[in-house]
């Protein structure tokens, strides 16, 4: 369980690195994660006890203002479990989705047709585009794409599925 969180949003990578260094040196905190929001805008998340998070954020703000701009800062004492999950999501470790055991397995012919289609579309396709092309329900298209993605045949970027380069 996390005792307290400190969040610092800054403009500029140099300001973020400077702020993170100052926060870690100023107090007994641990850098939990960072998130690049827009080009040049970063959020740093530290954890520790509440007083340490406050001291770290004070030092981080001072350092970031020397080299960039501080957008916002926030200390959260005893964060709720859902808030912890959100921070864990920032850390690229989301909760594992529960797979439905009765998810239909695509047949080989459908998989071959889908792979042939994805070979011809260089920029990849979304589940909605696949569903419209084959006349499938959206859930069937999503399941087919996810099965091929799980098998390592496809790669996924945002909502687009593409063939993996060989």
Curated annotation (Swiss-Prot):
A cellular component term from Gene Ontology for this protein is: ethanolamine degradation polyhedral organelle
Keywords from UniProt, A to Z, are: Bacterial microcompartment
Record localization:
Bacterial microcompartment
Q: Which GO terms describe its molecular function?
A: structural molecule activity
Q: Is Glycosyltransferase included in the keywords of this UniProt record?
A: no
Pfam families listed in its UniProt record: BMC, EutK_C
Which pathway or pathways does this protein act in?
Amine and polyamine degradation; ethanolamine degradation
Q: Does the keyword Transferase apply?
A: no
Record domain EutK-Ctail: where: 109-165
Enumerate the Gene3D superfamilies for this protein.
3.30.70.1710, Winged helix-like DNA-binding domain superfamily/Winged helix DNA-binding domain
Q: Where is the BMC domain?
A: 4-88
Q: Which GO terms describe its biological process?
A: ethanolamine catabolic process; response to X-ray
Q: Which InterPro entries match?
A: Bact_microcomp_CS, BMC_dom, BMC_shell, CcmK-like_sf, CcmK/CsoS1_BMC, EutK_C, WH-like_DNA-bd_sf
Q: Which family does it belong to?
A: Belongs to the bacterial microcompartments protein family.
| Entries under NCBIfam families matching the protein | PRK15466.1 (NF012010)
Q: Which PANTHER family match?
A: BACTERIAL MICROCOMPARTMENT SHELL PROTEIN EUTK, PROPANEDIOL UTILIZATION PROTEIN PDUA
* Its biological purpose: Probably a minor component of the bacterial microcompartment (BMC) shell dedicated to ethanolamine degradation. It might bind nucleic acids.
Q: How does it assemble?
A: Monomeric in solution.
Task: Give the protein's recorded name.
Answer: Bacterial microcompartment shell protein EutK
What organism is listed for this UniProt entry?
Escherichia coli (strain K12)
Organism lineage string: Bacteria, Pseudomonadati, Pseudomonadota, Gammaproteobacteria, Enterobacterales
Gene name per UniProt: eutK
């Amino acid at each position: 369980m996390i005792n307290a969180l400190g969040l610092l949003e800054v403009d500029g990578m140099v300001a973020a690195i400077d702020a993170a260094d100052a926060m870690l040196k100023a107090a007994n905190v641990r850098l939990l994660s960072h998130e690049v929001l827009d080009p040049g805008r970063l959020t740093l998340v530290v954890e520790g006890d509440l007083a340490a998070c406050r001291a770290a954020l004070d030092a981080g703000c001072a350092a970031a203002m020397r080299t960039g701009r501080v957008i916002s800062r926030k200390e959260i004492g005893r964060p709720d479990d859902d808030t912890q999950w959100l921070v864990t999501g920032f850390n690229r470790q989301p909760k594992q989705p529960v797979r439905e055991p009765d998810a239909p397995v695509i047949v080989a012919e459908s998989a071959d047709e889908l792979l042939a289609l994805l070979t011809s579309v260089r920029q990849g396709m979304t589940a909605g585009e696949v569903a419209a092309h084959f006349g499938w329900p959206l859930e069937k298209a999503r399941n087919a794409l996810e099965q091929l993605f799980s098998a390592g045949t496809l790669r996924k970027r945002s909502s687009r599925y593409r063939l993996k380069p060989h």
